[in-house]
Amino acid sequence: MHKNTFLSYDRVRPVKAGQIIEGKVFFMAQFTNQATLSYNNAVINSNIAVGEILEVLSAAKTAVRDEYSQNDTVTYVVSIVNAGPTTFSGLTLTDDLGAYPFGTGTVTPLSYVSGTILYYTNGVLQPAPAVTAGPPLVVSGITVPAGGNATIIYEAQVNQFAPAALDSTIINTAVISGGGITPITVNETINALSEPLLTITKSVSPVPVTENGRLTYTFLIQNTGNTAVVATDNAVITDIFDPILSDLAVSFNGTAWTEGPNYVYDETTGTFTTVAGNITVPAATYQQDPTTGAWIVNPGVSTLVISGTV
């Protein structure tokens, strides 16, 4: 993405916007100027002079992956190209880390990961520039050599202010400024990954259980992801009961299950396995805290209960 950057220098030959000369792409910015002449209470306007300023700096910003998930790390690459004969130094990169309005202020869904800055000029790694973690993230002391390029790479952590629902996005904006240039703005958008995020916990009751008594295992499956687990996902739960249980009673989300269609149990080894396609878990729902702006996750939950005689 290119923005207008105004710069003038000697011996500029006329070129068209976007024209390639000696392997370099040049872009034009046009300006106009008009003078006035006042005399004897009269005012005369001059003709309008039209000039063009040759752009020599361009920039682009990309994410290594265009999707994110909860607590993910995103790697950003900012590339600055100098198509002119003069080195630019003292440039500053300011990244808003995806800040967006909330209430009367803003919240920021990304946090800079300390120590991850990499700074290259013409492909050669340079000493790390000065970094202020922010938000916003500020990287200063950038130099772009004449006819060359600079690349800044850094990582950001997805935090509690990042929306996670389906079709959510983080729009990230960075501005390159300083060194006498007109600021250049670059943007990158990443999308919330569509996926389930499952955890499972197991509890037992009663504790202790009497010999030849009934023992119950409860499996709580939680989904903090924005996508439900459906039959075609073929989720399976496997367990080996020790001590081995007999006379099993199994239910899933309060509905009794039958051995064969829903599960398989080997009473000689204690191995229990659900049949693929029977375990389903709804997607999570999300709500934003009205005070802090942090996103609260309400997991989707399914429960498998297995009881048997010890």
Per-segment meaning from a language model:
Residues 1-27:
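N-terminal amphipathic/basic-hydrophobic helices that include classical n-h-c signal peptides
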Residues 14, 23-310:
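Exported/extracytosolic protein signature
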